[in-house]
Amino acid sequence: MKTLLLTLVVVTIVCLDLGYTLTCVTGKSIGGISTEECAAGQKICFKKWTKMGPKLYDVSRGCTATCPKADEYGCVKCCKTDRCNK
């Protein structure tokens, strides 16, 4: 009986998401990039390109709760795995 109870506890711990925190690449293309753990409720990484001129884009990355909209002359990539927005 104790073995069954212990097995159930172990299976429960393995199957539950106990405080998993998403890690995203953050920063701008000009200021350098790093990684950070996202705050509670932020379960999406994003990478946003904004066209600044011919062949010139400003790129920003980070964590978000909802995928941001692309600007008229840009695009956005959203994803949900660690460092998927490189």
UniProtKB/Swiss-Prot annotation:
InterPro entries: Snake_3FTx, Snake_toxin-like_sf, Snake_toxin_con_site, Toxin_cobra-type. Pfam families: Toxin_cobra-type (PF21947). It is found in: Secreted. Disulfide bonds join C24-C45, C38-C63, C67-C78, C79-C84. Residues 1-21 form the signal peptide. One of its GO terms (cellular component) is extracellular region. One of its GO terms (molecular function) is toxin activity. It comes from the Eukaryota. The keyword Disulfide bond applies. Keywords: Disulfide bond, Secreted, Signal, Toxin. The keyword Iron does not apply. Coiled coil: none annotated. Expressed by the venom gland. Belongs to the three-finger toxin family. Short-chain subfamily. Aminergic toxin sub-subfamily. This is Synergistic-like venom protein. It comes from Dendroaspis angusticeps (Eastern green mamba).
